[in-house]
Amino acid sequence: MKLTRRRISGNSVDQKITAAFYRDMSQGLLYYDSEDNDCTDKVIESMDFERSWRGRILKNGEDDKNPFYMFVKGLVGSNDKIVCEPIDVDSDPDNLDILINKNLTGFGRNLKAPDSNDTLENLIRKIQAGIPEEEVLPELKKIKEMIQKDIVNRKEQLLKSIKNNRIPFSLEGSKLVPSTKKMKWLFKLIDVPNKTFNEKMLEKYWEIYDYDKLKANITNRLDKTDKKARSISRAVSEELREYHKNLRTNYNRFVSGDRPAAGLDNGGSAKYNPDKEEFLLFLKEVEQYFKKYFPVKSKHSNKSKDKSLVDKYKNYCSYKVVKKEVNRSIINQLVAGLIQQGKLLYYFYYNDTWQEDFLNSYGLSYIQVEEAFKKSVMTSLSWGINRLTSFFIDDSNTVKFDDITTKKAKEAIESNYFNKLRTCSRMQDHFKEKLAFFYPVYVKDKKDRPDDDIENLIVLVKNAIESVSYLRNRTFHFKESSLLELLKELDDKNSGQNKIDYSVAAEFIKRDIENLYDVFREQIRSLGIAEYYKADMISDCFKTCGLEFALYSPKNSLMPAFKNVYKRGANLNKAYIRDKGPKETGDQGQNSYKALEEYRELTWYIEVKNNDQSYNAYKNLLQLIYYHAFLPEVRENEALITDFINRTKEWNRKETEERLNTKNNKKHKNFDENDDITVNTYRYESIPDYQGESLDDYLKVLQRKQMARAKEVNEKEEGNNNYIQFIRDVVVWAFGAYLENKLKNYKNELQPPLSKENIGLNDTLKELFPEEKVKSPFNIKCRFSISTFIDNKGKSTDNTSAEAVKTDGKEDEKDKKNIKRKDLLCFYLFLRLLDENEICKLQHQFIKYRCSLKERRFPGNRTKLEKETELLAELEELMELVRFTMPSIPEISAKAESGYDTMIKKYFKDFIEKKVFKNPKTSNLYYHSDSKTPVTRKYMALLMRSAPLHLYKDIFKGYYLITKKECLEYIKLSNIIKDYQNSLNELHEQLERIKLKSEKQNGKDSLYLDKKDFYKVKEYVENLEQVARYKHLQHKINFESLYRIFRIHVDIAARMVGYTQDWERDMHFLFKALVYNGVLEERRFEAIFNNNDDNNDGRIVKKIQNNLNNKNRELVSMLCWNKKLNKNEFGAIIWKRNPIAHLNHFTQTEQNSKSSLESLINSLRILLAYDRKRQNAVTKTINDLLLNDYHIRIKWEGRVDEGQIYFNIKEKEDIENEPIIHLKHLHKKDCYIYKNSYMFDKQKEWICNGIKEEVYDKSILKCIGNLFKFDYEDKNKSSANPKHT
């Protein structure tokens, strides 16, 4: 039963209460979020089963305009009277057929009571024909009685299901044993004395079942049945039901012999016969198979499945297929039980004691959160590994290793790269230039500062490799310690990891801390703030008002981003100016609007028009204040936000009232203003009131509700998730009030439009950021100082935060240094390999995990939660330090002495047509006027530092090719694109206010656009096409599209790595359970999983293969792949894990080729065959990733080979755009279009399908298709002379 959280009706019609599911080893139950008591009966009784029945009978069950709504409501509602009256058919009897087909489902039309010949459709027609009520009403009462009995039965079944949905184990003394009938039965499949799988038990079931008899019955029935999907399913279902009824009734006639002794130790005797209850469990598994492949209810199927059923029903009925699939399902459930037992042992059993308080939903939730947090680091590590690997790709485009984190790779790098680097100045220049993309390396940009010593830089990179290797091997591999515990091990003097000298890393993080002042100055400059505001103005704002800038303050995960706050505030401000600003003078300006005292907070949010730079400077100034002043101050004074929680609810209620009253005024001219409507239902009505608790506690409640609602929305339940919007609105008002309080006196001077006149940029910056930092008006707070990481002999080691930035950075080099906080230094080296976007995503995951620590329950071995919370906050601020001090691409490129100036010839020539460089106009897109210096392009630099361009040259040869024709088209569009964009924006504002017209046609409401609006939409679409084409060309020419493909590549690989970690974790739990049940020796388990040596780098696959004997291997192969495998066959499957886990797809070359990405996906599915749900999730995960993050829809085709299903992309055209829909208010999916409308076909396309913008052009989609299919072995075949689009 799938039920974790469910919203149900409360005391009022519109009130919704969240019920959550809980289970332990004795029972399952439901409880309200606000209570701890068992509320299962109460919750089930309040669930709306009547609504479900209305939905089964009516096509739109909750639309009270449906002509049959009241009729069906009377049949379904226990307290409703049956309505036995004809409906209005506009005097045309033929309309009845139309109304029945349009409004009743097939199930509803054919619904009839037991022992009755009248369907619901027949009874409706009798009522319409005027048949007396006394003749029709008894039949309707029978249907009503049948529905009421069904509702009662469904409630009883749901109650029983919930109660029985418990953890299927119990404690007998200190022994964790199966407790449910089904789990006891499944565990009998393990033959403990012989330490094998009990195949004879399943064979005996099939012998008793005698499937050939059922097959003959099904075949005879289908020979007489039409070959439609539902007919086939019903026929098979009826034959199966009759056959199983006979087996249950006559069971004793088929079985002879004594029943076996109960328990796991059954000995696997050939004479063993199952008792009836166990055989009934087997029958249930057979029924589940037929329910899946022969679904009787249409809701369990779709067009694709129906077609497959019609084409393959004979195969689905074959004994070989049925037996294989039923056995697999049974064994999968056994494995799931063993894994669950091993999981509970792993997490909650230590020192021979069970943590019994966690053998329940709290414990299972604890496990889920811990594993999800560790997995969140995997994607970031995948990026870091790729970037480190890019350091060591030599000029011949070959790499000498598969995985940089292995010992073999490190030795190869030392001998083949670092030794050459030490003596080759050209290599050193190139090495420094690449390293400057990641770390604050000194390259010849200052005369008074020497270059970094090459030996120090080599040590830096070695430290980075060690750090990433350490994190990878303890994250990609399943380890007992949490990520935080693994980091703290680095500071343990007894740990081998403590031997790593991080003194060079400490020097580089010291530079970042010292650079904060300069970086902040650069931010003020690059954001345009110093161009529009004089120094004394900025200084007064910050110094006089007491605004301090903190680098970072730990946030709650619900706190909205500034861009969302400002956008919402600007929209509200605009709406209030339009609707409530003074109109009698015709003055709609900002000044007159400021008189509206009630909404003064919104006046800080001014719409940025046409990308005006002075407006952007103002917005950027507010952004700095939001992140570095407002949010840090909220930590000290929560009232800055909490004062606006209840006020925002009240504001929303009043807005709803005013909107309804305005609507009524327009609709009813005689509406009396004294009769204003008072509403109790509004968007934020269900949001809990603030009652004085801490902001963290309030946001925790809100987050729980938000996550529960997000899940319901994902499951296609009705309604919106308003919790995110609510907290955003709260912050809009709160931040506006903060600005009003702090900067009210400077408002007129701060707000645009502004002029650059008489503002000297350099003078302003010098005044704001003098050489003597103590004279600066900015007090920049950072929790880290130099002494956080380095102890200098004889000096204080206090961690003074604010003073870190105020120091001049000088120290006595003779002082002896003692490096500390290696946990932070290790993570710093890794973080420096990430982009800003990746750091933000990772930081968000850390924030969510930190916030969860306060509300989750923890087992007895987690005793240092305060220290964990503090470490998480430190790591979050470390991420902010790295993100804040990350140099821009132009800044890095300007420092480069070599590398960047040759990047086009070295890295990108294969992606650009030669004709481009022969034409002066198109050549200028990549080179400056000297024809030698490349134009600095962000995505080319990012690709150069991160992507496997040596591989992409082969994968995308002929696919990603920038042509002279495309460049000329781009140049032409560049000259006029602003006109198109401005026109598009103006038309969008106009079209937002138009509405579709409606006309009655054949009794249907038909929609259309009038001619005037049609031409506006036509012009909008034409402009949109030009803007979209420009974006496609721009993204391709500046290589943003190739970088997007690289991101897709990394994200897919990271998801796949996550699945290999799932496999390793599950094997750990499975083997642990096998040890616990006495079928695997503990020494073998220890040899595989419990290597605690400091140089342990995994090798999990090799250890499994080498440490299992023949009997162990046969048992594991039966459990995981349902067949006995020899050593080579077994090894061939589990070795599929390594190229995925080690990201070998990125490092392959023609001489060292790997499988295609498509093949790796299928290999992963084979590896996960022990868990069908997880196996099927592989392609779904990739589909969801591409769809949700990249607007790409992918189609897979399944084929069967030797009993295994393989998925492939049949054609590269199976990669499609998921378009962006514009003017959504004109998009009506299921509707009729007025046939007399102007340009009918165009209107039908726009209204029914939406006004679409394709995110990618066809050439990029083909590149993505080839990313999946490319294989060096098929290189000549797959990439020779492709047709360029």
Curated annotation (Swiss-Prot):
> HEPN-like fold 1: where is this region?
353-510
Keyword vocabulary terms for this entry: Antiviral defense, Coiled coil, Endonuclease, Hydrolase, Nuclease, Repeat, RNA-binding
Q: Describe how the cofactor binds.
A: Pre-crRNA processing is metal independent, while crRNA-guided target RNA cleavage is dependent on divalent metal.
Q: One GO biological process from the UniProt record?
A: defense response to virus
| Coiled-coil segments | 969-1004
**Which residue intervals make up region (HEPN-like fold 2)?**
1039-1285
> What InterPro entries does its record include?
Cas13a_endoribonuclease (IPR053395)
Instruction: Please tell me whether the keyword Chaperone is annotated for this protein.
Output: no
**Cofactor(s) it depends on:** a divalent metal cation
In alphabetical order, the GO MF annotations are:
endonuclease activity; RNA binding
Query: Looking at the keywords, is Hydrolase present?
Result: yes
Enzyme Commission identifier(s): 3.1.-.-
Q: Which domain of life is it from?
A: Bacteria
- Give the family, as the similarity comment puts it: Belongs to the CRISPR-associated endoribonuclease Cas13a family.
Any further remark recorded for this protein:
Part of a type VI-A uridine-preferring CRISPR-Cas system.
The task this protein performs is described as: CRISPR (clustered regularly interspaced short palindromic repeat), is an adaptive immune system that provides protection against mobile genetic elements (viruses, transposable elements and conjugative plasmids). CRISPR clusters contain sequences complementary to antecedent mobile elements and target invading nucleic acids. Unlike many single-component effectors, this CRISPR-Cas system targets RNA. CRISPR clusters are usually transcribed from pre-CRISPR RNA (crRNA) and processed into crRNA but this protein does not have detectable pre-cRNA processing activity on any tested pre-crRNA.
UniProt-recorded name of the protein: CRISPR-associated endoribonuclease Cas13a
